[in-house]
Amino acid sequence: IDTPGTWGRDYTREVIENYRNMAGMWLVGEDMPQADNRVTLHDTEKDQYGLPVPVVHFDEHPNDLAMRNHAYRMGSAVYEAAGGSKSYELPPFPGTHNLGTCRMSGNADEGVCGPSGATHDIPNLFISDGSQFTTGAAENPTLTIVALPIRQP
């Protein structure tokens, strides 16, 4: 609704007074797959059970940034055409659907499992979550994730 970090009595008053004239737009696009994005295990840090904690490494692809900037421009144009007077470009939502850590591929050199989720190297082991997706679509992946194990032998 407003710039990040905005808070306090004046902000609250402005939001409440203008609430009936506010709108929000959520624009979602595909994150391009990158081989260097990964989840590894920390060398020394452990969780409460003594297991290594995960370390997520994620860099945005230049197309991701270009797509976001395009969405900001087009979203602002929609609001301006509707008579809006203010638009704010908020940072990306800090939540993700982690995908691609056990990528689906035609062979073991390029990924972990095949189209049915069966792993290339370990017989009768199936990947049944979003980690087999090579990339994410512009929609929430939950229904597709639920469908994956239904089609597994």
Task: Report the location of each language-model feature.
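Internal hydrophobic alpha-helix adjacent to the cofactor/substrate pocket in enzyme cavities
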Residues: 75-82, 148-153
